[in-house]
Amino acid sequence: MEKKYVLAIDQGTTSSRAMLFDRQGKVAGVAQREFGQIFPQPGWVEHNPREIMTSVYTTITELLNNAQIDAREISGIGITNQRETAVVWDKATGQPIYNAIVWQSRQTKDICTQLKEAGHEQMVRDKTGLLIDAYFSGTKVKWILDHVDGARERARKGELAFGTIDSWLIWNLTGGKVHVTDYTNASRTMMYNIHTLEWDAELLEMLDVPAQMLPEVRSSSEVYGMTQTQYFYGEQVPIAGIAGDQQAALFGQACFEPGMAKNTYGTGCFMLMNTGDKAVASKAGLLTTIAWGIDGKVEYALEGAIFVAGSVVQWLRDGLRMFGKASDSQAYAERAGDNDGVYFVPAFVGLGAPYWRSDIRGAVFGLTRGTSKEHFVRAAVESMAYQTRDVLTAMQSDSGIELKELRADGGAIANDFMAQFQSDILNVPVLRPEVAETTALGAAYLAGLATGFWSSREEIAKQWAVDRRFEPNMPEERREQLYAGWQQAVEATMGFRIS
């Protein structure tokens, strides 16, 4: 039977999706299922790994039924996933020994403080390209081994397996036959040396994590194994692509050349710039990470993570009840005319790149009796664009590359006002693609390259198409005046303390 589709499994923080893509890279079907969030203590976020698997199985079944697709028409499966989230399970039973600790969770911050006080920061930075932070997987694994009775000893005996979500999905889909991850996910664990491309003995010793529990690290595009027959009506389908969500979006945006960059505007913002075969060490508060490993070659990226972006609009809607639906924010922002000197620094969980300050709170500046709801909404929407400029400034400083255009994706980029303001404040064109689902598309492309569904990156690059191009049209004096106000607001926010 002719292979007509590639299936992407996009396992996210709040939901799992299964998506079919045809040879033109267009969406041919989608199914989505949300799952529960677990908050055992303030600042802790966990998931039930079994519930994640159930959501994935359900979306696959729904997709095949709704699209009336024969499993034999699927060339391969690409997996993309919420990064850093850590699962530890029993190899014999396949049962998790604890919940998955989610990337957002701050429950390992005390471990991070101890590691910093012990003087490990520079070593971690040099080997992994990361900072010591509760965000990354390494301290999460250590926490589980520290807090589950007998876990570390069992791990040393080879009885337990660790994996990021991609590893967990593949283990289950293959019936426990395959324990792998790819370069992109390994590079987010704080245990992987991104230069030597191996699990690092010094990092493992620092965290007291036994090497026996770690997955094999493979390329981002190859056949890792076959699914068990029960998931695809008696058929086996090759699992052939893996990438963490942000790297998958970079690939889905066809940012294949050094200096090309994308920004994903979701709950937070994640901006990645391709730096080719150079692992550029950041001096400006960014992360150095692996973009992907394909064709026997690893390529790198600089990454800036902004913790609060689209979620500020959700907060205005749900917390302050300023409007009924998120899309209303565009009309409110446009009605305001300008920001009237109001700046909103949405540091609800601190500030991410390039500041990395988890100890500060959000703030609003410049309020007068004349400040309206519209000004407030506009300032909140503008904050996404200002934070992106902070990251881009750091990227250009680190890489020595001046950005020619920014490829944008994610829910918030549907807001035309935000997209235009972003272009204005960066003084760079912002391109919104025709296919908005770039994360799932990137995973599909990686799988399709491995199975021969697509022939090359050149073929993929030709498929990438612009929905709308936003050109900068703000006078330079006004642009710099607005950005200077933002910088003052950030500085004031960082100086504010609650005793």
From Swiss-Prot:
Reaction equation(s) it catalyzes: glycerol + ATP = sn-glycerol 3-phosphate + ADP + H(+)
Residues that coordinate or bind glycerol: 83-84, 135, 245-246
Molecular function per GO: ATP binding; glycerol kinase activity
Function statement: Key enzyme in the regulation of glycerol uptake and metabolism. Catalyzes the phosphorylation of glycerol to yield sn-glycerol 3-phosphate.
Gene Ontology CC annotations of this record: cytosol
Binding site for sn-glycerol 3-phosphate: 13, 83-84, 135, 245
The protein's annotated pathway: Polyol metabolism; glycerol degradation via glycerol kinase pathway; sn-glycerol 3-phosphate from glycerol: step 1/1
Family in the record: Belongs to the FGGY kinase family.
UniProt KW Transferase keyword: yes
Record comment: activity regulation: Inhibited by fructose 1,6-bisphosphate (FBP).
Annotated protein name in UniProt: Glycerol kinase
Residues involved in ATP binding: 13-15, 267, 310, 314, 411
Residue sites binding ADP per the record: 13, 17, 267, 310, 411, 415
